[in-house]
């Protein structure tokens, strides 16, 4: 009977740690997005972007930050998204007089 109680304690402890590990984030940024905007955003309204990859989402996403401070998710492989990224990269690499 003592062996059964000890075994039960070990199993419950192991189960508790397993649940704790599964509940941990996967190491990505907390602002991951799986719901993306399909509509094109004008480049002149964009300020910056960051790429997001997460095991929780089936695709790569980009989070654009607008000049008004809003964050908008978009699928990274859409043509307008690639053009917007190239535009922002060029804009930030161009030296200002």
UniProtKB/Swiss-Prot annotation:
Asked if the record carries the keyword Glycoprotein, the reply is yes
Q: Which cysteines are joined by disulfide bonds?
A: 33-57, 34-73
Give residue numbers for the modification (Pyrrolidone carboxylic acid). Answer: 24
Q: Which UniProt keyword terms apply here?
A: Chemotaxis, Cytokine, Disulfide bond, Glycoprotein, Heparin-binding, Inflammatory response, Pyrrolidone carboxylic acid, Secreted, Signal
Note one Pfam family from the annotation: IL8
- What does the record give under GO molecular function? CCR chemokine receptor binding; CCR1 chemokine receptor binding; CCR2 chemokine receptor binding; chemokine activity; heparin binding
Quaternary data: Monomer. Interacts with TNFAIP6 (via Link domain).
Q: What does this protein do?
A: Chemotactic factor that attracts monocytes and eosinophils, but not neutrophils. Augments monocyte anti-tumor activity.
This chain belongs to the protein called C-C motif chemokine 7
Q: Which organism is it from?
A: Rattus norvegicus (Rat)
């Amino acid at each position: 009977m003592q062996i059964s109680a000890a075994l039960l304690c070990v199993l419950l402890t192991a189960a508790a740690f397993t649940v704790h590990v599964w509940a941990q984030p996967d190491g990505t940024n907390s602002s991951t997005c799986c719901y993306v905007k399909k509509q094109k955003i004008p480049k002149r309204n964009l300020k910056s972007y960051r790429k997001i990859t997460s095991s929780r989402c089936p695709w790569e996403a980009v989070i654009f930050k607008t000049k008004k401070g809003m964050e908008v998710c978009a699928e990274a492989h859409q043509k307008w998204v690639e053009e917007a990224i190239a535009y922002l990269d060029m804009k930030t690499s161009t030296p200002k007089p």
